[in-house]
């Protein structure tokens, strides 16, 4: 049952019907009413699009005790022998002009004259949401009222709101004052609740309740699940605010708060700009709940043009703070912008309310977080984009959650924010160390990467330095690092290289490091006296990423002969960016020289048919942790 069914024309009323509490005789009330027959009356508007009460409506109610402050019933103009041929038509959309309304009634086989009321407070011809429709006869007007009132308008997402026009009819003058009315906001309504349901809920308790209006979405025509109820008595309005909180309407508890209506002049001015009203009553449903939630950082953006994208919204809302997520549902004409901080969302709502974005003015309100609370709290705990100062530990540099140099290169100094880890390729430490973007590339004329000092245990000859050698499932691809001269040297026959590979082996529990094992003597000259040389840097880099197979010096060499050979090693620096296959190729080229010198005897027979790396200064050879093709 619609709310308009609760009204009837005053001419149908018995003139002797007056409220029981009134002490004024019926005749005096009629005379007072008839004295103002031609006084134009304008409807009161809570929002820019709709009237809560038609100016000519009277309520048909049983006699009851009314509040002394209730406005007495008044007769309407036009009471007499002749019925009016003009109807009042309200709740018009801003785009409905006189041409549309006239064509609308013509499609219904009703020839009419239409006069759309325009705002006098604005220089532009702005619609103020109602008009007057004059029919060919009073019977035609009455037939249209009974047939089309509260039915859907063809081609629009709204219904006909019809009633008899007041005194002057087409000569109706707007913006005339009337008795004050007091509104309350009602939220948490069911989607199926209608105006009449909300009205009867309050009218059954408060006789001064004059109207109820549920707000609908202008695009979809669906209920927004909140509305406004108006009273002629301020006392009953205040009583409803206190005692109707949680009152059941169709089984749903109501949420009551004060509505702050805007003046008609202000509404007309906003309508001239195409701005949706932004009064407290409009923002009330979201502000009461969502704005009190400290974790809610999402802004609802309504009135978006269909050609706007997420990138356009980002440009408009990015100045107010860091944006976590932007979403524009397809075909809804709205969007959601989620910030990392609540203060940024508040600033955006206060600043961008009613702003022109694209070709339309937007309306803002509190929405609901599109990201889970866990993701939001994690984002708020991170460091801001402006930068931060902290010292990176070994685990942060080489751990799971940091970038693996060579797989995802980038600077890792102490003043930059951490990078996300990239997918790790199945390269070994030796191969990664030979890539141009690895740490070792610094010794080839490239920019070096400075890390904080790390002090791992001494290098073990029996331990698998790379975690990939021990069958670990960690998925890490540790990289070798060149050893700064200040941090590398022989201390009691032990070498302490500053290597990321050692740190990775320390993290991996399957690679057990023996803390006090000396390197083979044939490596000590390179790590001792000549550790500043280019060839030594290259040698130690490769040793840090390979597993020792034969730790002892050749039996064919005594100590003096070994020292003599060790004092003049082949220069392997030219191979600093070669792969293991390239090293094998160099070995084959030098085999004749090795066999002639006497300490590379039977080297060919000792090499299995796969790629190996060797150091030509001794009979030792190093087994790579993983064979690679040239293009891997």
From Swiss-Prot:
Localization, UniProt: Cytoplasm
Comp. bias (Low complexity): 466-476
Keyword Phosphoprotein tagged: yes
Pfam families the UniProt entry points to: RRM_1
Residues modified to Phosphoserine: 42, 54, 67, 69, 291, 455
Region (Disordered): 456-476
Major subcellular site: cytoplasm
Keywords: Cytoplasm, Phosphoprotein, Repeat, RNA-binding
Record domain RRM: where: 85-167, 182-261, 297-369
Ranges that cross the membrane: none
Domain of life: Eukaryota
A molecular-function term among this protein's GO annotations: mRNA binding
CDD domains for this protein: RRM1_NGR1_NAM8_like, RRM2_NGR1_NAM8_like, RRM3_NGR1_NAM8_like
GO CC term (a single one): cytosol
PROSITE patterns recorded: RRM
UniProt record, GO biological process: 3'-UTR-mediated mRNA stabilization; cellular response to oxidative stress; positive regulation of gene expression; regulation of mRNA stability involved in response to oxidative stress
InterPro entries: Nucleotide-bd_a/b_plait_sf, RBD_domain_sf, RBM42_RBP45_47-like, RRM_dom
The protein's assembly and partners: Interacts with cip1 and cip2.
Primary role: Regulates global gene expression after oxidative stress. Interacts and stabilizes atf1 and pcr1 mRNAs after oxidative stress, thus controlling their turnover.
Protein name: RNA-binding post-transcriptional regulator csx1
